């Protein structure tokens, strides 16, 4: 197998977060920006190729508590843990659903917060 094929296989096995780190490392190492070439390459492409740059551009997400579900007390506890709010503020947030629990967080953080809240029975959206 040639070096190029080996590198291609290694890149295929990376997660999305690892690929983002790789792109950032390339940008820093070689003093280039991946934004312009991606936009130029995506312009003539159709469908899926055009959707990829749109996903890459969104780096901040809001976690919205839609409904606390049946285990409201447990949801309040998790909201306190996630936000650092006091008991009253957390209860007000949960009672006022739908409301944002956390805003402008990374996708990984948003997914982790969503998982914690869903684990205790809440309904959550990521926007």
Curated annotation (Swiss-Prot):
CDD domains tied to this protein: Ribosomal_L7_L12
GO cellular component: cytosolic large ribosomal subunit
One Gene Ontology term of the molecular function aspect: mRNA binding
Keywords from the named record: Ribonucleoprotein, Ribosomal protein
HAMAP family hit by this protein: Ribosomal_bL12
Subunit structure: Homodimer. Part of the ribosomal stalk of the 50S ribosomal subunit. Forms a multimeric L10(L12)X complex, where L10 forms an elongated spine to which 2 to 4 L12 dimers bind in a sequential fashion. Binds GTP-bound translation factors.
Family: Belongs to the bacterial ribosomal protein bL12 family.
Protein name, entry field: Large ribosomal subunit protein bL12
This protein's encoding gene: rplL
